[in-house]
Amino acid sequence: MSNRLFFIKKCYNLAQLMRINQPIGFFLLLWPTLWGLWLSHKGIPDKVVLIVFVAGALCMRSAGCIINDYVDYDIDGHVQRTKTRPLPSGMIRKKEALVALSILLFIAFILVLSLNFITIFLSVVALILSWIYPYLKRYIYFPQVMLGLLFSWPILMAFTAINNPINSTAWLLFLMNTVWTIVYDTQYAMIDREDDIYVGIKSSAVLFGDMDKFLIGILQLCIVFILGIIGWKERFTVVFYFFSLFGVIILFMWQQILINKRKRIRYFQAFLSNNYVGMLVFIGIASSFH
């Protein structure tokens, strides 16, 4: 193989390692980031802050994927869906993964340096949590809670970035997004449930068992309730209630239909549809400040 082809192949494998070919994870991190930015600014955020947060979300999502695969190196090879990933398949060496991770973290660090001290501190806490998360599924049945905290962290940072106090609305949004993350990551974990049981990995999907559909429904009702409280508290416009609240209810009903079919492809479709949940909430929030 020529050096040029080798380089192209290596870049392609690194892109797969960072899930560039699967942007759903980036969007699921981006939407709550945008919710927090628009709510903290009461409208369109400062351009520099917006760029820092969007670029930071992209870097940290990719870094999180590398951390997860690095920690799960000895497990992914035994799971049908993950055994072809770059690290367990040998297409990327562990040292190469660490180099890529270091570059991403350096870029994220440079970005966050443009923000204030408390926001920098919160970003360091987020990095620590990112390393803890992959280990939790070996010991507890709710690693999804930690993932929820991680994916909700930018909401707090969005408020501190402009020296705003983390008010009750921010905490409600934080709570809602944490519950939402538990919902969609449980849907995702349902895909690998049989494999996870075989290799001894714990997840909410394994814990819920046959009660998964019902318990996900309870969590979805909690999300709708919290979203309604936020809309009422912030006196959002009718667009919020029509697009966000009503739209989210319809999407959650659709997800219930999908997961009821008890097929892996349907679980994955339900998971993917959460991108539209995040988008609809953002449309409702953004439209309420114009």
UniProtKB/Swiss-Prot annotation:
Its EC number is 2.5.1.39. Keywords: Cell inner membrane, Cell membrane, Magnesium, Membrane, Transferase, Transmembrane, Transmembrane helix, Ubiquinone biosynthesis. GO terms for biological process: ubiquinone biosynthetic process. It is a multi-pass membrane protein. CDD domains: PT_UbiA_COQ2 (cd13959). It catalyses: all-trans-octaprenyl diphosphate + 4-hydroxybenzoate = 4-hydroxy-3-(all-trans-octaprenyl)benzoate + diphosphate. The chain crosses the membrane at residues 24-44, 48-68, 98-118, 142-162, 171-191, 214-234, 239-259, 270-290. It comes from the Bacteria. GO terms for molecular function: 4-hydroxybenzoate polyprenyltransferase activity. GO terms for cellular component: plasma membrane. Its cofactor is Mg(2+). Pathway: Cofactor biosynthesis; ubiquinone biosynthesis. HAMAP family: UbiA. Belongs to the UbiA prenyltransferase family. Catalyzes the prenylation of para-hydroxybenzoate (PHB) with an all-trans polyprenyl group. Mediates the second step in the final reaction sequence of ubiquinone-8 (UQ-8) biosynthesis, which is the condensation of the polyisoprenoid side chain with PHB, generating the first membrane-bound Q intermediate 3-octaprenyl-4-hydroxybenzoate. This is 4-hydroxybenzoate octaprenyltransferase. It comes from Blochmanniella pennsylvanica (strain BPEN).
